[in-house]
């Protein structure tokens, strides 16, 4: 049985440091590329069945809002379809093998290559 829990409140201090880091990078002409890493399809299915994953959606919403005020590029590779990955290429629910890692790197280059210097 899965236990339910409420989402933790965002750490405002961590956000402050994160946003200051992005501002510093932007001041130096750099656009950070932020990659939301994949979750195994089976785990995503269970999360959906049990109405879990709110933190990830909060992260997406936060980064989408931040894109409006800062120069960042966000790539959401939560699903394996988003980067051409394979379900068999996970060590567990969230850790990808070298083969999926290579696919993620290829997708990052294709979708955000102009920011990689």
Residue ranges and their predicted role:
Residues 54, 60-117:
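C-terminal regions of proteins
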Residues 1-74:
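Conserved, well-ordered alpha-helix/loop/beta-strand core segments that scaffold catalytic motifs
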């Amino acid at each position: 049985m899965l236990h339910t829990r409420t989402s933790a409140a965002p750490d405002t201090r961590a956000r402050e440091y994160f946003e200051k880091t992005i501002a510093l990078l932007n001041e130096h002409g750099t656009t950070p590329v932020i990659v939301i890493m994949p979750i195994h399809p089976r785990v995503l299915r269970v999360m959906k069945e049990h109405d879990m994953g709110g933190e990830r959606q909060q992260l997406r919403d936060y980064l989408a809002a931040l894109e409006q005020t800062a120069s960042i590029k966000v790539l959401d590779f939560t699903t394996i379809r988003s980067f051409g990955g394979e379900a068999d290429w996970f060590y567990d629910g969230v850790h990808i093998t070298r083969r999926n890692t290579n696919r993620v790197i290829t997708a990052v280059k294709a979708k955000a290559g102009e920011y990689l210097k």
